[in-house]
């Protein structure tokens, strides 16, 4: 049953997210706008939608939980909050992320979303927390009609979105891609340019061993990485961040490298 749910995961997310808004929830103008943007994103599968959903949905659910705790905990309030929390949990599953990134694929591409590098997790959470705080305070300012505070917050929110939204979206554009010509690592966070492995140069693709000496492009994230072994040496051009994390030069010649996907490409 669980596997069947994940196979058609888009519909449970949509239904639960709509049910989440059907009962009294204390939403103001800002919260309703955020809810609507997320709702639209659940119907339009795309990497941009994935970024939008995963950034905004937690804020809406948090606001609903706070409202429910401040009111009498009726069975209806508990049911509504539960719908929101379950929907949010499904939005952060590997299957849901894969559905969005695959929807933007070209032709015969098969995209496998990469896990977020461990050193980037904390800065990402801090950035999101600042963004979420501004949104929550803006919601309270609008509800209390405190426009003296609300207008500067709105301007700050626009500036933060302009600055940080592209950085957050980069995490939804990191893929291992299977194409007719072979495999491509599309990761502008750790790589300066895409890494193409043609089929004739591929020796093996399998789970990495613990003592593997392959170049680690997984970003030291959790889980067992995938090792891609090559017949001939190939150039890997690292971004400034990638070179800094690996403590090496920005151009390397390698015969094997590691990546960490949210779903295995070995099936």
Identify what each model region corresponds to.
Residues 1-73:
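Membrane-anchoring hydrophobic segments
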Residues 213-238:
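Short, surface-exposed polybasic-and-hydrophobic patches located at secondary-structure transitions
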Residues 173-188, 195:
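Polybasic phosphoinositide-binding surfaces of eukaryotic membrane-targeting domains
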Residues 1-8, 42, 74-134:
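N-terminal membrane-targeting/pre-transmembrane regions
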Residues 62-69, 90, 229-267:
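Terminal and domain-flanking low-complexity segments
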Residues 183-185, 194-212:
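Phosphoinositide-dependent membrane-docking surfaces
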Residues 103-177:
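Anionic N-terminal interaction surfaces
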Residues 29-37, 77-87, 149-158:
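Hydrophobic core segments of alpha-helical transmembrane domains in multi-pass membrane proteins
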């Amino acid at each position: 049953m669980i596997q069947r749910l994940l196979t058609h995961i888009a519909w449970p997310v949509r239904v639960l997210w709509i049910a989440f808004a059907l009962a009294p929830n204390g939403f103001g103008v800002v919260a309703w706008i955020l809810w609507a943007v997320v709702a639209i994103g659940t119907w339009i599968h795309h990497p941009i939608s994935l970024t939008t959903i995963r950034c905004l949905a937690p804020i809406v659910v948090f606001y609903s939980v706070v409202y429910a705790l401040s009111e009498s905990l009726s069975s209806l309030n508990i049911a509504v909050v539960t719908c929101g929390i379950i929907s949010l949990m499904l939005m952060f599953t590997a299957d849901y992320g894969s559905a969005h990134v695959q929807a933007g694929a070209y032709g015969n591409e098969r995209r496998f979303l990469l896990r977020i590098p461990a050193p980037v997790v904390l800065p990402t959470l801090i950035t999101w927390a600042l963004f979420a705080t501004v949104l929550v305070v803006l919601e309270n300012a609008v509800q209390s009609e405190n426009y003296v505070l609300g207008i500067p917050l709105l301007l700050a929110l626009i500036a933060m979105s302009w600055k940080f939204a592209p950085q957050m979206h980069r995490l939804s554009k990191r893929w291992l891609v299977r194409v007719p010509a072979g495999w491509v690592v599309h990761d502008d966070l750790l790589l300066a340019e895409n890494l193409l492995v043609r089929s004739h140069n591929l020796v093996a693709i399998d789970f990495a061993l613990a003592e593997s000496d392959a170049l680690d492009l997984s970003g030291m994230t959790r889980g067992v990485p995938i090792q891609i072994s090559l017949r001939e040496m190939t150039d890997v051009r690292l971004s400034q961040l990638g070179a800094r994390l690996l403590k090496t030069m920005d151009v390397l010649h390698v015969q094997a490298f590691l990546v960490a996907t949210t779903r295995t490409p070995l099936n």
